[in-house]
């Protein structure tokens, strides 16, 4: 509400979202980023897009070199979505550490290890880099204001799994003299195999990738899409699937803009 009130009174805001570059882009990514693009087009605002290559190196069993290759590929993938090139800025954590790190240590000084442990369930076996990472993800909330000598609100559309980071960010950011960000949570897009969980590029055979051909998409849906069907083929043909868990129906909620048509399909 504060952000919208500020916007209504003539103030600008900027968008911040991101990507952990460790694999190919899939339909779940697109469902969030297409909304980000809509926001940018609708409000004509700047977008700061963070590629958290450090996060993926610290959290996943993948080499630094592999992550850099995925960073390059994912940058091309994001650019292909059609964001306004004159108002879209890419931040790569390792490449732009020179401007991110000085602010990250200011954030880190306000976050206790106890807070990180309780938020993420860390133990003594976690590497110290992963403990620090939340500070890096916090910086783009206010970095554009520092670089441009402004005091604008930040709006963050994000997947719900990123919420623990930004809960911490919101708790400490006021202590540094910056405005708390506004956050819009996006639901996980159901995986092909069922309504529980999220789409993931780690299992590309059962995930719709943005690089898949129409033939590959059709094959994956026919082979893996969960329908919540009846006990027998005959009953399924008569009664159909369970629309509350049917993956195709869940996906149509994201991509079918006509609510009337969607209701007819559900019937």
Locate each region found by the language model:
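N-terminal Rossmann-like or analogous alpha/beta NTP/dinucleotide-binding catalytic cores
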Residues: 1-14, 21-143
């Amino acid at each position: 509400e504060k952000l919208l009130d500020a916007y209504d009174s003539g103030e600008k805001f900027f968008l911040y979202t991101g990507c952990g570059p460790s694999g190919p882009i899939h339909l779940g990514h697109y469902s969030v980023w297409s909304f980000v693009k809509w926001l940018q087009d609708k409000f004509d605002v700047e977008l700061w897009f963070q590629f958290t290559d450090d996060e993926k190196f610290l959290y996943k069993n993948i080499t630094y070199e592999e992550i850099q290759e995925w960073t390059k590929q994912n940058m091309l993938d994001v650019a292909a979505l059609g964001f306004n090139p004159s108002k879209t800025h890419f931040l790569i954590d390792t490449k732009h550490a020179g401007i991110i790190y000085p602010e990250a240590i200011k954030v880190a000084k306000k976050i206790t290890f106890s807070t990180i442990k309780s938020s993420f369930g860390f133990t003594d076996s976690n590497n110290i880099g992963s403990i620090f990472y939340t500070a890096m993800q916090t910086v783009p909330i206010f970095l554009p204001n520092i670089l441009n000598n402004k005091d604008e609100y930040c709006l963050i559309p994000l997947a719900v799994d990123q919420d623990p980071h930004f809960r911490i960010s919101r708790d400490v950011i006021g202590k540094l003299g910056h405005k708390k960000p506004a956050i819009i949570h996006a639901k996980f897009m159901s995986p092909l195999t069922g309504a529980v969980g999220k789409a993931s590029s780690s299992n590309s055979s059962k995930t719709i990738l943005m690089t898949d051909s129409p033939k590959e998409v059709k094959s994956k849906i026919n082979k893996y899409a969960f329908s919540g069907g009846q006990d027998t083929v005959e009953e399924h043909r008569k009664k159909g699937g369970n629309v509350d868990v049917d993956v195709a129906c869940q996906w149509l909620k994201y991509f079918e803009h006509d609510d009337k048509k969607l209701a007819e399909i559900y019937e």
